[in-house]
Every structure is written in structure tokens, then in C-alpha cells.
């Protein structure tokens, strides 16, 4: 997901997005552990999406606190 798409969301939607991404990442890790994951690059992409969403969430929370 692009940063511009994430910036358009509010804090509650971003928190839900992070939860969804963490669940997806967990599922991918389990598939990798059981040798069912064909595209291992999806792990990296999901991890980066999580980091991107958490960064924008922190920016929004910090901006709201000021």
C-alpha cells in the first residue's frame, strides 16, 4: 500500500490496517514454516507495509498531540 493511501486514512482506520497487516504477516510466516509459501518476497513486502503504516500512525498521533 502506498503512503499517500495511508495518509488519507484516519487514526482508527490506520490502527485496523496495522492489525490486518500483522495477521497477514503471521499467516505468511506460518506458510513459510510449513513449506507452503511460494513467493517469499511477500514476507518482505508485508513487513515493509507494516512499518509504513506504523510510521504514518505515529506521525498522525504526534501531530494530534501538538
Swiss-Prot record:
Gene name tied to this protein: rpmC
GO BP terms: translation
Protein name: Large ribosomal subunit protein uL29
Organism the protein comes from: Methylibium petroleiphilum (strain ATCC BAA-1232 / LMG 22953 / PM1)
Keyword set, alphabetical order: Ribonucleoprotein, Ribosomal protein
GO molecular function, one term: structural constituent of ribosome
The UniProt record lists the keyword Repressor: no
Xref: SUPFAM superfamilies: Ribosomal protein L29 (L29p)
Pfam families: Ribosomal_L29
UniProt KW Transferase keyword: no
GO cellular component, one term: ribosome
Amino acid at each position: 500500500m502506498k503512503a499517500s493511501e495511508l495518509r488519507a486514512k484516519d487514526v482508527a482506520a490506520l490502527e485496523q490496517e496495522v492489525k490486518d497487516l500483522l495477521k497477514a504477516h503471521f499467516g505468511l510466516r506460518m506458510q513459510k514454516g510449513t513449506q507452503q509459501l511460494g513467493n517469499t518476497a511477500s514476507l518482505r513486502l508485508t513487513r515493509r507495509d507494516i512499518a509504513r503504516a506504523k510510521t504514518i500512525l505515529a506521525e498522525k498521533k504526534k501531530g494530534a498531540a501538538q
